[in-house]
Regions:
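Hydrophobic alpha-helical and helix-loop surface patches within well-folded domains
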Residues: 152, 181-384, 388
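Ala/Thr-enriched low-complexity intrinsically disordered regions
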Residues: 391-392
Length: 392
């Protein structure tokens, strides 16, 4: 990804294997200017593909594994959709859930398509000294007088909605966590200048979350680095991108002298929620967006249990039920009522609701009651040796 002052050029190399040889290849793409398409080093002419209505269609592709190289230009500085890659507050950042990655590159933008990713980001060192993406940083290099590049490698297959990029001028707070097996993980909080003194509670909350997931679910963090970016201009509350969580500052920053207990607990809970997604959502993700609550309802249940274990189980349960009655019950009784597993939708972004999250968490809690804690835990600890089977 080559970041310039007025545009970004994204060159991708996809290794593809046809499941049904003879069928056309269809990829998603929105607001992209295609500069070139190449299959197995052979450039395609405009007559060999069509690009319309958010779909790239290549009718004739090899029947065996092949490599597709695409080169597209996009303008994140004029992107007002708040999806894909966009500029806000002097930073470039991404929001790819649910269908935002198609605004970055041509891709099979579905949650059941899992891929290994390696990303190289190049930008101006003066305007973008920090370049972040998923996984571990494996190479840093100087490119010309005022340009640099960082290459990130994520060894675990993930869908495109978990891709993340942040580029800009941020301050770093660094710490470390030693997992139960003895691996050392580097923890980094990236904040805007002047926010450094207000990060201690968030860092401590992250460490507590990691330790709780190990002790309760026997789930260790699986990479060498974990990054959280907290910026005021992020349009969502928080996003669980693999190893690069992006937060609105209000859910990370806290002054211990002035923050209320409720604010501190909220920060701790949301940081835990996004961290718990590392397994319940990222490593094991949903087959399609109709299954959204299988990651969100489950992870809400997990963060509820985390807060209950660290503080008061009774108080936490009362708070959760009060919230359910005041918000989700009203949704269920109104014109926007919908099931936890919807049968259809016009736009998936409309389904990030209290029904999917909080009512979904209650269904997970009910399953634990019906199965009993031991059988429930055995079911939840399922992981498949095949990444393709991890979309369930």
């Amino acid at each position: 990804m080559n970041i310039q002052d007025d545009h970004v050029v994204v060159a991708s190399m996809l290794s593809l294997e046809p499941r049904r040889p003879g069928e056309p290849l269809v990829l998603c793409g929105v607001d992209l200017a295609i500069e070139s398409l190449v299959i197995d080093q052979a450039p395609l002419s405009p007559e060999e593909y069509s690009f319309a209505d958010g779909r790239l269609t290549i009718p004739n592709v090899p029947g065996q594994p092949f490599v597709l190289e695409t080169r597209c230009r996009l303008d994140p500085y004029s992107n007002s959709s708040l999806e894909g890659l966009y500029a806000s507050g002097g930073l470039l950042s991404t929001q790819c859930e649910a269908e935002g990655f198609r605004r970055i590159s041509l891709h099979p933008d579905r949650p059941d398509v899992l891929s290994r990713w390696q990303v190289r980001i190049e930008a101006s060192r003066s305007s973008c000294p920090v370049l972040l993406s998923n996984g571990n940083a494996v190479q840093e290099e100087s490119v010309g007088a005022d340009r640099h590049a960082v290459t990130w490698d994520d060894p675990f297959p993930k869908p495109s909605y978990l891709f993340a990029l942040v580029a800009g001028d941020l301050r770093e707070i660094r710490d470390h966590y030693t997992t139960a097996s003895g691996r050392q993980v580097t923890l980094r909080l990236h904040v805007e200048e002047g926010d450094e003194p207000f990060t201690a509670h968030a860092m401590a909350s992250l460490k507590r979350s990691m330790q709780w997931d190990e002790s309760v679910y026997n789930l260790e963090y699986d990479l060498d680095e974990y990054n959280i970016v907290a910026v005021r201009h992020f349009n969502m509350g928080a996003m669980e991108n693999k190893s690069l969580n992006i937060f609105n500052s209000k859910l990370v920053l806290a002054d211990a002298e002035t923050a209320t207990d409720a604010e501190l607990e909220r920060i701790e809970s949301v940081i835990a929620h996004e961290y718990f997604h590392n397994w319940s959502g990222n490593r094991i993700t949903c087959r399609d967006w109709f299954q959204l609550s299988l990651k969100e309802g489950l992870t809400v249940f997990r963060d509820q249990c985390f807060t209950a274990d660290l503080h008061s189980e009774a108080v936490k349960r009362i708070e959760d039920v009060a919230m359910l009655r005041n918000t989700q019950f009203r949704e269920d009784a109104g014109p926007t009522a919908h099931p936890v597993k919807p049968a259809e939708y016009q736009a998936i972004d409309n389904f990030y609701t209290t029904t999917i999250y909080e009512k979904g968490a209650e269904l997970i809690r009910m399953l634990r009651t019906l199965l009993g804690p031991e059988r429930f835990m055995n079911c939840l600890l399922y992981t498949s040796p095949s990444p393709r089977d991890n979309t369930t």
